[in-house]
Amino acid sequence: MQKKSLLIIGAVWVEPNSSAAGKRMLQLITQFLERGYKITFAAASQKNEKAIDLISLGIDAVAIELNNASFDVFVKELQPTIVLFDRFMMEEQFGWRVAENCPEAIRILDTEDLHCLRKTRAFCLKKQVPFSVDELLKQDITKREIAAILRCDFSLIISTFEMELLKNTFKITDTILMYLPFLFDEITVKQEKKMQSFEERMHFIFIGNFFHKPNIDAVLTLKNEIWHLIRRQLPKVEIHIYGAYMQQQIQELHNKKEGFIVKGFAEDANKVVESAKVVLAPLNFGAGIKGKLTEAMLCGTPSVTTSIGVEGMADNFPWNGFITNDFSEFALKASELYTNKLIWKKCQLNGIAIINSLYSKEKNALLFFNKIEEIQRNLENHRTANFLGSLLQHQTLQATKYMSKWIEEKNK
């Protein structure tokens, strides 16, 4: 057995230029590589041209199949010391196989964001009813995701809001939860001075992965509710819409006369964000930390967003711009930020303070690996204390296991 080896079971192959989730996964991979781990990345999805070359990083890339005993042979031979599940669906599919074949491996769930929270909010928005915890508790996806969290040795939670929700609403002990936001190098004064100035920047920007429904909704909100109000105050300004997997529905919004410019995939997201003056993100639903907003801070670009956008991202620090759920006020604040250099600069510095205080790679990664070492030293006691997790491992996964075996036989 490798002294330090990690198996990552990915929902998709790693695409850091397409999504915040891809960036997050690459951040985690980098931390394990820096600590001398031998890494194997396995996924059952199709690889495309946007996926990075893992082999060039010294990582073994392995294609696996759902509901197939070949995974048992593979994982038993590999015997990793840690298994990281990329989102709860991967734990549902492969968790029981890992538990059976590698009982000593620490099982970590990277939630990315709480899918149950995002899906329930989308459901409530569609039904035009207010989001409530009661509605969250009714959803099947909530039961599935919470069960996966309980079955793992610990789970990575990306926002402070989600940490509080899991502890207070679902009564999950923080011994099996770990707050781990995005991991960034701190921004130095020298780097801040090199950022493009207020005068050098032009236009508004929105950037996001359009596989992600909150991003589609946000761009439609910009087009239908907000942009005409901004143009009334700033008739020559443009908004540039960037993102991976852009559907025709979004492409058709392009209107040069109105200054609503749909650009498509950005090869270098940093470059386009740091040359824009303001990021607009009118998010009506979603969960977790918003990559577009941390990217804005890293690029020194202030933003206007909603309470959903900022949720769990800034603790008690003043925001990197403005927060409002009212479309008229959103347009006013966007125009103010675009035209007022003093306010713009103050908001830029707020963003730098948030990155350096809350998203420090050095500080957060140290806590993460301390947690791993602590559990490795006391794995048996840690699992004994998580009785509900043991119960679910025993009961729920028996059903999952035999359903999977039935599908396996059926596929032969």
Language-model features and meaning:
Residues Q2-S18, M25, L66, F204-G208:
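Nucleotide-activated donor-dependent transferases that construct or modify glycoconjugates
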Residues P80-T81, E274-G288, T301:
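Acidic donor-binding loop of glycosyltransferase active sites
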Residues Q93-F94, T142-D174, I250:
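A short, active-site helix/loop in glycosyltransferases that binds the activated sugar's phosphate group
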Residues N168, I172-N270, E274-S275:
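Conserved catalytic-core segment of nucleotide-activated headgroup transferases in glycan assembly
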Residues N320-S328, E336-K341:
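Conserved acidic donor-binding segment of nucleotide-sugar-dependent glycosyltransferases
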